[in-house]
């Protein structure tokens, strides 16, 4: 039975950026104005279904996320925050999140539908010409650059996650929820797809960052142009050895430009690997680069654009007065970040209208585009050292301020916090942390360009380092459990510390809010360790147990308490 010819969204309400539908707008066969056609797949937290708009017949994908399973996994607050952010991402080569609908049982993400996969296209074509492969590669790199600029790293790029629309344009998928929920502890349990994963990821030494996406893009480019994987073995340990050795065959039929670019991307040492910005300047990459994908100049606005403020309020559930007040604040906040994102989206949209490329003029829509009978001929074809103080215990070092600093969110993607580079969005907490050390050495001339570095580096014995970390946590007011030996032996994961920290300004009568963090100590090389801090979300602890069942989605959590704790922890480590 098809929904009646009425506005099924008329009685819906908005809560924290998600649309709440009345019961009459939900059934087994439709969700609001979308008629469910078939199930496309099933994951750990629900199904993905194909649906069409009942008026326009436009296809969309509905991703169902079970609220009960989210509550059991203690992930729902992070999911809500991530959804509200992802709704703002608009790029012609990233799958769009059109809307979020909540029902009593599920969170339903309405996302752009793209029916093809680059994987299937490669299988059918065997290998592509350089012009064809370069076109796909340009779209992938520009989309990845857009996400890195807005603090999102994919970390699981592979042809299966690179979808193709009817016009054979790339649409990068799985930037968000499915990966957040299924990956848990990324470095402990998974390395994404082994054939496309960088050596630092499969070895579990460091938290994955932008260099990982560059490696994966290099593998994808190789596969498109050569028709096979550079590293492949059915026996996983052998595959890991091949990836770590970084020895692969470069075919003679590739042009010198393509060979040079691939060799600079597929480099085992992430410090020596080419960056996205360097790829952007590569001559081979820039051949026939469409106008809408060319780098744009930053536009510094002196006032708040009312159109952007309105969109921001709708997407994040904030009042316009609150948004304007946040924008006027001298301190950085999530509203400013989201505003900058929407502002860039607007600039991209204006550029896209001037492009000669087909079908790039509607990618910023906040709802599925109207049905079009347009058919392209293409669819008919086969498809980052400041100081090194000597402490009584281990020696700690903080890396030079990189292009970005990292905040992880227990997922296949990670959210990054930008530095003050180009006067953009300087984080006060990071500045406070930097002021705790002697910055006189930070201005020394570096022999190497800025890179991505994560965590806090230290030298010494692992037990001494762990003791220093526990002491720093104690001085910071965090709570933790000290590991105790069982039958004279310590648990195997003693290098992982789980802790929580009460957020002072979130304290209310009968309720305390805690930020949960996880610290992991990695051995980068003999005698050299890296301490990584990961956010495990936030949780409200009630003084009245019966209130714990009230676990709704009304409180929107920010990442700033986690960042404050990170800055405090670094200061305590250096003041030890």
UniProtKB/Swiss-Prot annotation:
Domains (record comment): The regulatory domain (RS) also called auto-inhibitory domain (AID) inhibits kinase activity of the protein kinase domain (KD). The ubiquitin-associated domain (UBA) localized within the AID dampens kinase activation, probably by restraining alpha-gamma associations.
Sites where the protein binds ATP: 40-48, 63
PANTHER family: MAP/MICROTUBULE AFFINITY-REGULATING KINASE, NON-SPECIFIC SERINE_THREONINE PROTEIN KINASE
Chain positions with Phosphothreonine modification: 189
A GO CC annotation given for this chain: mitotic spindle pole body
Name of the protein in question: SNF1-like protein kinase ssp2
Quaternary assembly: Component of the AMP-activated protein kinase complex also known as the SNF1 kinase complex (Snf1c), a heterotrimeric complex composed of a catalytic subunit alpha and 2 regulatory subunits beta (amk2) and gamma (cbs2).
Organism listed in the record: Schizosaccharomyces pombe (strain 972 / ATCC 24843) (Fission yeast)
Family: Belongs to the protein kinase superfamily. CAMK Ser/Thr protein kinase family. SNF1 subfamily.
Gene inactivation effect: Prevents assimilation of glycerol and fails to induce expression of glycerol dehydrogenase gld1 on glycerol medium. Leads to diminished mating efficiency.
Modification Phosphoserine occurs at: 442
SUPFAM superfamilies: KA1-like, Protein kinase-like (PK-like)
